[in-house]
From Swiss-Prot:
Homodimer. This is Protein GrpE. GO terms for cellular component: cytoplasm. Participates actively in the response to hyperosmotic and heat shock by preventing the aggregation of stress-denatured proteins, in association with DnaK and GrpE. It is the nucleotide exchange factor for DnaK and may function as a thermosensor. Unfolded proteins bind initially to DnaJ; upon interaction with the DnaJ-bound protein, DnaK hydrolyzes its bound ATP, resulting in the formation of a stable complex. GrpE releases ADP from DnaK; ATP binding to DnaK triggers the release of the substrate protein, thus completing the reaction cycle. GO terms for biological process: protein folding.
Length: 203
């Protein structure tokens, strides 16, 4: 073999050696086959975890709002028990005024002064009630409302629409949007009928 032929064969041999060396490396660089079923399982698990996180967030927010509402209610209605006790004071003032007819006041300065003082006390007490969210329940002349009124009797009155409150025996009160005490009332019957609530006169 001549020197030139030997030189021509050497690059070919080196190229073959390099290909042989790169063969295993090229094969190891290829990405492993991934199980498509496993991918689906992982995707399902991720979706479930996302839903669980969203649910937990919603529950946390609902709990926070509920606690805030409870705290607000405790503040708004903390005086409920005291208010119910004080209502009897307003009742007694009203009874005292109702027991003195206007005719008895005429010509009696002492009695007039006394009733005027009681009226002022009543107005001041009701104004104090208002400041704390305690309000009188509208009753006289109103349509009977079982949510606000308690019917104690029915009164024959053809001139009034049936179910109209024609007598207030005891005032009712609300505290903000809650009923402290229903108004005890008498309601008309025998007059024109109007669609609405049926009146239950049972105590």
């Amino acid at each position: 073999m001549t020197q030139d032929q030997t030189a021509e064969q050497m690059p070919a041999a080196e190229s073959a050696d390099q290909s042989a060396d790169q063969g295993p490396a090229a094969e190891s660089a290829a990405p492993p086959a991934v199980d498509s079923e496993r991918i689906k399982e992982l995707e399902a698990e991720i979706a479930k975890l996302k839903n669980d996180v969203l649910y937990a967030k919603a529950e946390t927010e609902n709990t926070r709002r509920r606690l805030e509402q409870q705290a607000e209610d405790r503040g708004r209605y903390a005086i409920s028990n005291i208010a119910k006790d004080v209502l009897s004071v307003a009742d007694n003032l009203r009874r005292a005024l109702d027991s003195v007819p206007a005719s008895a006041r005429e010509g009696n300065e002492s009695l007039t002064a006394l009733t005027t003082g009681v009226e002022m006390t009543e107005r001041e007490l009701l104004a104090t009630f208002e400041r704390y969210g305690i309000k009188l329940v509208a009753a006289q002349g109103e349509r009977f409302d079982p949510n606000l009124h308690q019917a104690m009797m029915e009164m024959e009155d053809p001139s009034q629409i049936e179910g109209t409150v024609v007598l207030v025996m005891q005032a009712g009160y609300t505290l903000h949007d809650r009923l402290l005490r229903p108004a005890l009332v008498g309601v008309a019957k025998g007059g024109p009928k109007s669609g609405g609530n049926n009146v239950d006169t049972k105590v």
